[in-house]
Structures are given as C-alpha cells and as structure tokens.
UniProtKB/Swiss-Prot annotation:
Protein name per UniProt: Protein KleF
Family annotation (Pfam families): DUF2761
Alphabetized UniProt keyword annotations: Plasmid
Name of the gene: kleF
C-alpha cells in the first residue's frame, strides 16, 4: 500500500487483506469498540520489512470528542483527530455501517418527536455544535435561531425513548 500521509477515505478497501477503512470516531462511538478487532496500518513498518498491521485493542475518546486515543494490543497508544481512519474486516465494517444507519434513523425519529412538541415539521430542526463538543437541537423562528434542547439532555433522552418505543412497536407490527 502507498504511504499514508492523510487518513484513507472511509470505505477504502485494502487490496491485499480486504480490510475496510473506517473513521476512528465512528468505531469509538459504536458497540464494536473493543469487541471487534481493528487494525492500524503503518507504512513505515512496511518500508522496514516489518508487518505493517498493528492490532487495536480499543479507542478512548477525549472529553469533547475532539481527539481519540487509539490503544494498541501491544500496550502503546496514539492520539489522533476525529477524521483519522483505521481498518476493520469487511464484515465488521458492514456492522458499523448498519449500526450507523439505525442510529441516524433513531436520531431523525427523535427530532420528529421534539418537532411535534414544538408544533414544527421535523425538517425545521437541525443538530449543531455551536460550542465545540456540545451539540444541541436548533430551529429558526421569526428571524431568530432558538435552541430546543441539548443533545443528551433530559428532554432529548425522553424524546429518544419515545422514538425508540414507537420504532419497536412498528417493528413488532411488521413481524406479525
């Protein structure tokens, strides 16, 4: 493989192993973190004739999510930014993509619950982090930008629980 000067784009398939590049941030936020083996590619090790793949034991996010500690099975760590990528097996990368899709669907449903409570259409709401590491739900009304709630606030958690319950009921109905 070519020397890595920038992160490989997510979805890049390494031709000799079939491993797929994923964002460290997405892996860290998933249930796969620490359970599914991840691999760090080192072009320098490959240049020296060594195995270029290092097994990743897990990823620890820093406060605010601006950087992450990649913890190697050999005991070392490397701090990286949120856009850095490493590699998973194709099967685990597919699991990560599926989980991300489910999370995005739940997030949209949560926004719909919050919007309904405000008497607004769901598309009127958006999630932004006006303060780094502190995402919140915003909407525009009468020329002003208003905040509905912070993500992970009690209001967000209640709306998310309502959305998850509605989703579970819908799934149960379709299974009969």
């Amino acid at each position: 493989m070519a020397k890595q000067t920038l992160p490989y784009p997510p979805g890049f398939v390494e031709p000799t192993t079939g491993r797929v590049a994923v964002m460290v941030r997405e892996y860290a936020d998933s249930d796969l973190n620490g359970d599914a083996p991840a691999y760090w590619y080192s072009a320098q090790s490959e240049e020296w004739g060594l195995d270029p793949w290092r097994l990743v034991e897990g990823v620890d996010p820093h406060v605010g999510g601006g950087s992450f500690d990649v913890c190697f099975a050999s005991g070392g760590t490397r701090t990286v930014g949120p856009l850095m990528t490493f590699f998973l097996s194709a099967a685990h990368a597919a699991q990560l993509i599926d989980a991300k899709g489910e999370e995005l669907a739940l997030q949209r449903a949560t926004l719909a619950v919050i919007a309904d409570g405000l008497g607004l259409p769901a598309k009127a709401l958006r999630i932004e982090a006006k303060v780094e590491g502190r995402p919140a739900v915003f909407y525009d009304q009468d020329g002003a930008t208003l905040c509905a709630c912070a993500v992970d606030s009690d209001h967000w958690r209640q709306a998310r629980a309502t959305a998850a319950t509605a989703s579970a009921i819908d799934k149960a109905r379709t299974n009969f």
